[in-house]
Amino acid sequence: MKLAGATLLITGAGNGMGRELVIGAIAAGAKVVAVDLDKKALATTKQLANADSKSYYPLALDITDSRKVTALPKKIAKQFYPVDILINNAGIIQPFVRINDLEQKAIAKVMAVNFTAPLNLIKAFLPTFIARKKGHIVNTSSMGAYTPVPGQSLYGASKAALSALTAGLFSELIDTNVKVTTVFPGAIATNIAKNSGINLQGMDAGSSKIKMTTPQKAAQIILAGIEKDRPRVFIGQDAKVMNLLTRLNPQYAARLIQKQMKDLLK
């Protein structure tokens, strides 16, 4: 779907890749509903995007609140414009611990943000997409969905679930005008650990241990994928290489990642 003239809803728009998606979309002539928990961060995103009230609608929202999510399509259409493109970008990682040491509270939070919230957003907006005979759903999965990362087993499971959901949705909608895209980012230079409430050295932006794609570059790749209606978008050589390697030699791929990440595992 062409970005110019379209209205996008982007979650996690207050920082990192989400913020860059907003900036890129507005630069391409789109209007954006920017969703994030942090109201101040949304104001900063608006400023960085050089946006005005005609092109930018900030919405401070907890996306795990299913009641508020269900009410979004009518609320946004009434106060702004009907949403054409839904980008489920928001996500969090788990504490870097083994499954046996993962607390139930952390399990519930990761699954709520990474899987249940995107599902509820899809269920909220899909009926209007089908009725209007146009729309695009973009779900941000992860390289972790197909590459085993020690200490991030639940995170990987949540992203694998989202990937499987998106693949099924693509199949269900293949004969409609509603497009579906799964995004598989590799390592992106964002503050995902900090934003997930996790104090962790070596994972966030500025880490020298892992070569990362910039959020700006990642956003450019995603937006280009939307315009070309691509069903799958891989970001970074790491995501592409590990996708192939995991298929060809899963044991070697697991050992390779374990060697890279073992120092982070508590």
In which residue ranges do the predicted regions lie?
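Canonical Rossmann dinucleotide-binding motif of NAD(H)/NADP(H)-dependent dehydrogenases/reductases
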Residues: K2-V33
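The beta1-alpha1 cofactor-binding region of Rossmann-like NAD(H)/NADP(H)-dependent oxidoreductases
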Residues: K39-K40, A60-A71, Q104
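Active-site helix of classical SDR
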Residues: I122, S158
